[in-house]
Amino acid sequence: FEMTLACMQRADFIQRIAREAAQDLVMDNVRYAELRFAPLLCTRNGLSPEAVVEAALDGLRGYPIKLLLCAMRQNDPADSMRTVDLALRYRDHGVVGVDLAGPEEGFLPSRHTRAFKKAESAGLGITIHAGEVSGMESLRSAVKEGFAHRLGHGIQLSSTMQANGGLDPLAWE
């Protein structure tokens, strides 16, 4: 991850990465895709978050590809709010939602409820990575306190199969 991030600290590199990802998807006959990345992690060398998003959007221009901006669950919830605000600023330019990524253990989505409530109220798409290593507590928090429309991973849902063969009630909500 660190090596990838090191390559995403210049606007021209971010633009190229986005463009090449879009080209690869189109060559694979993908008709629509959403790329996700954490723009606040691409500011180590002085780029503003806005410049980061604009570079990615420039790289995607002309392709059927949109962006999800990731907040990192281990980071300060204020960073999540900054990410949501950034997504709102660029929602009419190709940003379609936000995502909460990063390590589940010890970092429930409930830490970021304020930011994701704002995203939900504004109509942004919300994806939360949950249920990869942690169980139902993480999944419930993603849906109930993170307002998730989609779950990244969610593989722990299968381990919650009830004895009668049914899914946990959360799966039907």
Feature map (PLM): residue ranges:
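Active-site glycine-centered loops adjacent to acidic/histidine catalytic or metal-binding residues
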Residues: 129
